[in-house]
């Protein structure tokens, strides 16, 4: 498989992110906490390059080539982490939703996603910033794996039982979430938002490792 080298920092969207972080940092200084969203983690980026259907087949039939692609995307993702940190982000994050149990088994997650997510965490720490990992869907079957990664923060979906998140991750890392972004934030009422927020507060009562928000991207109609 041929690898292609290019200057990620010259990408227009990356340039917009860099400039936005710099403007916010200059204006607010340390008054606000800036999360630099580096978007896709290595497994997810490889999935996007090949398309989900083809990449799932690659994992089963062309494992060596699939791993080479993930190694390549790991390098690309690490560069974005460095760029965001150098721009002034207080924290960086990646999303790896295709690596969740809704798409692949927990065993496949441990082989093809977990090691590369951990390398993103290590890269962030080398840059002196905390790291957040986002995974959509029901992550119940990989919570114990996540607990061993020493993440600073995790952003999980409403589909994962909050009691289990608190049990396995509550004393290890900060939780961002887990309000339903569509059913509650976009289509629900203010009472629905208040009720779901209170449920989260009740379960995490006494635990400061919580930042309440949507567990995934909020639709623009919200």
What is the meaning of each model-derived region?
Residues 2-222:
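Active-site loop segments of alpha/beta catalytic cores
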């Amino acid at each position: 498989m041929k690898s292609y080298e290019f200057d990620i920092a010259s990408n227009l969207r990356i340039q917009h992110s860099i400039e936005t972080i710099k403007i916010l940092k200059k204006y607010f200084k340390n008054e606000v906490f800036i999360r630099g969203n580096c978007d896709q983690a290595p497994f997810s980026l490889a999935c996007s390059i090949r398309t989900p259907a083809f990449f799932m087949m690659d994992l089963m039939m062309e494992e060596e080539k699939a791993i080479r692609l993930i190694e390549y995307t790991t390098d690309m993702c690490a560069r974005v982490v460095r760029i965001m940190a150098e721009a002034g982000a207080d924290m960086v994050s990646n999303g790896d939703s295709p690596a969740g149990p809704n798409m692949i088994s927990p065993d496949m997650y441990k082989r093809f996603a977990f090691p590369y997510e951990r390398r993103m965490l290590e890269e962030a720490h080398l840059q002196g910033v905390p790291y957040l990992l986002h995974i959509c869907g029901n992550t119940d079957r990989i919570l114990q794996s996540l607990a061993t990664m020493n993440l600073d923060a995790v952003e999980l979906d409403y589909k994962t039982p909050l009691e289990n998140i608190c049990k396995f991750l509550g004393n290890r890392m900060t939780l961002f979430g887990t309000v339903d972004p569509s059913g509650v934030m976009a289509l629900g009422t203010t009472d629905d938002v208040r009720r779901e927020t209170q449920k989260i507060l009740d379960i995490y009562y006494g635990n400061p490792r919580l930042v309440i928000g949507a567990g995934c991207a909020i639709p623009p109609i919200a």
